[in-house]
Amino acid sequence: MNKIFKVIWNPATGSYTVASETAKSRGKKSGRSKLLISALVAGGLLSSFGASADNYTGQPTDYGDGSAGDGWVAIGKGAKANTFMNTSGASTALGYDAIAEGEYSSAIGSKTLATGGASMAFGVSAKAMGDRSVALGASSVANGDRSMAFGRYAKTNGFTSLAIGDSSLADGEKTIALGNTAKAYEIMSIALGDNANASKEYAMALGASSKAGGADSLAFGRKSTANSTGSLAIGADSSSSNDNAIAIGNKTQALGVNSMALGNASQASGESSIALGNTSEASEQNAIALGQGSIASKVNSIALGSNSLSSGENAIALGEGSAAGGSNSLAFGSQSRANGNDSVAIGVGAAAATDNSVAIGAGSTTDASNTVSVGNSATKRKIVNMAAGAISNTSTDAINGSQLYTISDSVAKRLGGGATVGSDGTVTAVSYALRSGTYNNVGDALSGIDNNTLQWNKTAGAFSANHGANATNKITNVAKGTVSATSTDVVNGSQLYDLQQDALLWNGTAFSAAHGTEATSKITNVTAGNLTAGSTDAVNGSQLKTTNDNVTTNTTNIATNTTNITNLTDAVNGLGDDSLLWNKAAGAFSAAHGTEATSKITNVTAGNLTAGSTDAVNGSQLKTTNDNVTTNTTNIATNTTNITNLTDAVNGLGDDSLLWNKTAGAFSAAHGTDATSKITNVTAGNLTAGSTDAVNGSQLKTTNDNVTTNTTNIATNTTNITNLTDAVNGLGDDSLLWNKTAGAFSAAHGTDATSKITNVKAGDLTAGSTDAVNGSQLKTTNDNVSTNTTNITNLTDAVNGLGDDSLLWNKTAGAFSAAHGTDATSKITNVKAGDLTAGSTDAVNGSQLKTTNDNVSTNTTNITNLTDSVGDLKDDSLLWNKAAGAFSAAHGTEATSKITNLLAGKISSNSTDAINGSQLYGVADSFTSYLGGGADISDTGVLSGPTYTIGGTDYTNVGDALAAINTSFSTSLGDALLWDATAGKFSAKHGINNAPSVITDVANGAVSSTSSDAINGSQLYGVSDYIADALGGNAVVNTDGSITTPTYAIAGGSYNNVGDALEAIDTTLDDALLWDTTANGGNGAFSAAHGKDKTASVITNVANGAVSATSNDAINGSQLYSTNKYIADALGGDAEVNADGTITAPTYTIANTDYNNVGEALDALDNNALLWDEDAGAYNASHDGNASKITNVAAGDLSTTSTDAVNGSQLNATNILVTQNSQMINQLAGNTSETYIEENGAGINYVRTNDSGLAFNDASASGIGATAVGYNAVASHASSVAIGQDSISEVDTGIALGSSSVSSRVIVKGTRNTSVSEEGVVIGYDTTDGELLGALSIGDDGKYRQIINVADGSEAHDAVTVRQLQNAIGAVATTPTKYYHANSTAEDSLAVGEDSLAMGAKTIVNGNAGIGIGLNTLVLADAINGIAIGSNARANHADSIAMGNGSQTTRGAQTNYTAYNMDAPQNSVGEFSVGSEDGQRQITNVAAGSADTDAVNVGQLKVTDAQVSQNTQSITNLNTQVTNLDTRVTNIENGIGDIVTTGSTKYFKTNTDGADANAQGKDSVAIGSGSIAAADNSVALGTGSVADEENTISVGSSTNQRRITNVAAGVNATDAVNVSQLKSSEAGGVRYDTKADGSIDYSNITLGGGNSGTTRISNVSAGVNNNDAVNYAQLKQSVQETKQYTDQRMVEMDNKLSKTESKLSGGIASAMAMTGLPQAYTPGASMASIGGGTYNGESAVALGVSMVSANGRWVYKLQGSTNSQGEYSAALGAGIQW
């Protein structure tokens, strides 16, 4: 390519200049300080002083004044470069009176002064006094070490301080002042912006006239003010004037300590108050106003919602337009109102206007204090699902429908009389049908009962039968009462009559048993009288019968003594003869009697039949034995003949018995003279190893049969056995034999005590295997043992020491203990995350607990935020009272309060609805109507009690009335004679002890067999008197009706009853309770045996015996019953005392199993109870040695102090959250294996840090909202970010990215125009159009890094690449250039490619070193070195040129392509296009080319054409000659037609055996085998040649061509030309290029023959048409015009770039601010967040709202941002996580 010029930067003129292509260029420097320094240095060097600085290595060059030193330079009048401390300091002074006194210092400029070591002073009167300080600007001063002062009168006094801007001041250490008159006074304070002021330590003022007057304060925005410690003001005119106050937004004010105002014109003036929202206001301590126009004006007040108002202390207004005006009030809902103190309004439009009132529900209102309303006068609501309230005299609980129903139902049931409960809860009318009438209420019924009952007479102390005017009255229809010693039943007349008719009456001398017409009669039902020596009781027939029976029995037994019966004395004297007496001689009792040596002993009780028993046996026992003997008789039929004589049988038994033969030591079957005999009828004996049974013949027969069978089988084996015996005998020596001593098989052999056992098959290796194992198995085991031994040996020391370092089981604690050494507690680290499931027993690690704690902390924060609201809500809500187990309507200081507007609840047995007053009134009204007695209910619900008159006394309630009747029924149901349903009779029990009582005024009842009348005392007295008279013995009737004991004197004895008297008469002792010396094991006892058979009998009337440890009294049945009853009651479990005194088994149900005794129940309880384990110090839930569940556990309280057990559902709920958190943790944590951590570093998914070999230094994010990621990363300021090892972000919102990066600079906010002056070039900026955040630093002072692989920026605030910057700078100049102009209003040109040039509107050059000139010209990125000149020209290929409107390159450089008429492959370096495929243009005024690669003009081509014409004529002539030749050849052909193909003539030879030639066309010639001349006048020469066109000669075919060689150069126009002629012709011509297929490419012409050199086209006329070539003059003029236009556009572009840069920076700041917004992360949580960002001098503020779905899967985010450029942006996103 012919590159004739290039554009380079001229530092002298400060502009880009067109220069020769060989000129060298450094390009324009981009840095400000470098640009300024370059300008200053260049200005100094080019001054009129004419000084020069050569490169000396020896003595310095002195062009000014100063003392000598090594390496110093002083240039300028009065300049001094003097090092006081070191003569080799190499200081430099340039300029008038410039002084560089510091070591290695530089003073450049008039009267500059640099006294600090390595200091630099640039500018008139600039002073750099501190070491390594820099002062840049007229009169700038850098006093502090390492400080920098940039700008006119800029000044730095502090260490490493920085002041940039006119009159800026950085006074304190590490301070930054950036902006005109910006001032930063205290340590690390920052002032950015014109007149910005940061006067306290760590303060930051960002923005014009911003002020940060408090320590750690931040003022961000124009005229923002943060005057107190820790205060923050963000926004124009924002103000935070108290400690820790925060004001964010335009004109916001945070005036109170710890207050916060966020939103336009919001104000938080109270301490710790918060105002969020446009014009929101929080004016008192702890007040919170959130929402547009919200106001919280009292202490602790909260207003949440647009235009909400909280004007009462501790009040909360929540909802749009809500208002809480009362103290401690709560308004919850849109337009809700809570104006009463302690009032609550919940719901849209709800209003609680009165004190301590509660309005719940939309539109609910209260009109009275201390009430709860769930509706209003027009709208009522039910309270449903309400638990039953407590019912007591102190209860204030609300009662639900089911309770009211239960009460009504119980009243109806107690009232009886058909009363029921109506659907409205009232009790229906009662109806009592009494004898005196039907009554419809209790009072009337009681009155009716009172007049007709048997009343108690207190005076008489008895029931009185008087009624009306009659003093005495009968009691009729009295059932027969029980007559017994303890009976207190009334007896009726018939009983008394029967008694009189059947009584044993006294006839004057004795009781007469005469009855009716019978002179004598029986006395029946006589209780057995006492039979004692002094008894006078009458004896009954049974007693006498017993006596008589005994007498009869005795008579039989002592028949021999009947003669002695007549004389009792003789009988007594002869008693010894009839007694069973001891016979000393015989040593036994003797039954001899009289002359009989033997006699019977009768009535003998059955004796014990045991081995040790000495009891006599009676006949029945012997009878049983005899019966058994008789039964056995049939079994010994062979001895029947011997039965008649037992003695003989017994004597002969020895001969017939199977007797033991001592000699033989066995039973012998010998019998008589036979030595042997059969034993028949032998039962088959057991055939077992241990059986000793005899076997019978059948068994032996079976055995013999088997033996016979075996004998046959054995016979065949006998020989073998014989042989085997020998073998076995010999085998003993070679066998593995059992060693009894060793108890094992022995491998001993011969004289060897041990020997091998070979060929042993591998035995089974199982727990129960007894197989022998072989050597290979043992080898494997030994190898394993050896391996294990080695491992164990290696582990021994570790194991020995492991005890101290292991997590061991602590038996006492029942758990693993982490105690270590002397420390009772220690950490357990590297614990893998445990499973968090309901049944998990895994240990959890700190991260899991940390996550849980973080979640808890988050929840705690959320809960804390709600605590006050909930607390207030609890005060005003209908809340659950745990102690009472119910909802409580207590409110404020009132223990009780109303619940109003309550809809009527459902009344049923299972209703839990609350009941309102009208329902209770209805029930009470119905109840009072049924109570009667004047009971009533007032309109206020007050019940007036009934009045019942009972017995002349008034009673005001049913209970007292019933009690009165009960005192008269027992006082009339207490004094009434009532029916005892249990006893089935009327009971006269009375009083609190139910003692029997007297019934007085009883008229004489009828006495007859059918009478059921009650008998009065006089009637009974008459009977008793009669009986007493009949008894005699001085018996009389006592005052209580009893009869005194009679006295009978009989046989010298005194008896007090008839029985005793009769007993005295009785001469026998058979009925007495006698001593039995044989009883009680021979120790003797009284025997109650009675009667002939001496059967056991009852002893009645036994008095209660003493019950004590020493008592030996007899105990009666009642005592035993009482004891058993007590035991049964104590046992419980439905145990009862049976009629026989036994106790039924109790039933205890434990764990759904019944147990019938205490022991089993206790065992079951002990096995199934949750018992205390002393060792574990806890309840042990193990069962059968295994851990077991505890079910049905109520949910325990969850609090920090709770010790309640928690149930599975609670833990499951926690586990679900933990699981969700665990999943989130696992997703974050990633691979936590040690190997992975060692290889990849510790961290979480996608975030890793490898701290191997580094001391532990955690990241620190101490700033509010700060983030630090990386080893020892530090983010110490608010919202700062530090990422990378040792990275530090120490400025608010600053970003330090990369290891060792430091972000400590606050970006300047302000404006400045770009200017060029004698002091140099000042690059302008405008940072006021957006919020400025902290700088992004990717390095540190002296430590830099590149940002590589940055994509080209496309938006205003995008980062730009070096390529873009170079192209932008290289494409334009900052000042106009002469002879270069452009006139257009279209978009500017853009030179993107490196070293590229773009001239013209809309022209874009993307290719490196490309040139684009013209309107909308394009050079593609791939078209390196491409040139497009002309409107819409396109250079699409590298090293190619498109020239002219619409011209395009279409192929570019080609390699090895086939050129037209060229045999050798050709190469090209590019393409020159002056048109396009559908639009070509001429190249005119082309000079005649001379070189091989020159273009040729039409004139040259005409010469060639003339030559071609001449050649054509020569060819025509040749054709004529050929035609003539054809004729001759034809003649020859005809002449030689008969010549064979292989024949020849003298001058014509062929050598072929192919096909014949074929001349088909007229006058055609075909010569050669297979040649064809098909067309007229055609010639085909050569084998296979084809001539198929007229007038042509073919030397080949379409598929087989031939050259015609040795062609002489043609002369005539029709002569053939040879290649050399054609080359000569083409050498001087310009040809079109050829396409890849060899065709001519009329769109391309290659000059210079395609060689690497270039060709000039001279004398080119100025192009006129769009497709004409342009000459150099035209191009030069175009370039000049383009340059002029470009310079103009460059100025405009510079401004646009500046603005674009600002907008891009603002956009980046917005993106960073939105990126920095935190988001909610716990399920169901929401978050409102604020963030800030700054980039390249621009800043932004972002607000966001985020929420997480309840299941934690979905996350939604909405965020918006505004920046200092006044632009707004928003983003919306949603995501799902798994």
Swiss-Prot record:
GO biological processes: protein transport
InterPro entries noted in UniProt: Adhesin_Head_dom, Coiled_stalk_dom, ESPR, Pilin-like, Serralysin-like_metalloprot_C, YadA_C
Residues that span the membrane, as ranges: 1724-1734, 1738-1748, 1757-1763, 1767-1778
Domain of life: Bacteria
Residues annotated as signal peptide: 1-53
This protein's UniProt keywords: Cell outer membrane, Membrane, Protein transport, Signal, Transmembrane, Transmembrane beta strand, Transport
Keyword Metal-binding (UniProt): no
Major subcellular location class: other
Signal is among the record's keywords: yes
Domain notes: The signal peptide, cleaved at the inner membrane, guides the autotransporter protein to the periplasmic space. Then, insertion of the C-terminal translocator domain in the outer membrane forms a hydrophilic pore for the translocation of the passenger domain to the bacterial cell surface.
Record's function text: Mediates aggregation, biofilm formation and adhesion to a range of extracellular matrix (ECM) proteins, such as fibronectin, fibrinogen, laminin and collagen types I, II, III, and V. Mediates adhesion to human T24 bladder epithelial cells.
Complexes and interactors: Homotrimer.
Family: Belongs to the autotransporter-2 (AT-2) (TC 1.B.40) family.
Name this polypeptide is given: Autotransporter adhesin UpaG
Organism: Escherichia coli O6:H1 (strain CFT073 / ATCC 700928 / UPEC)
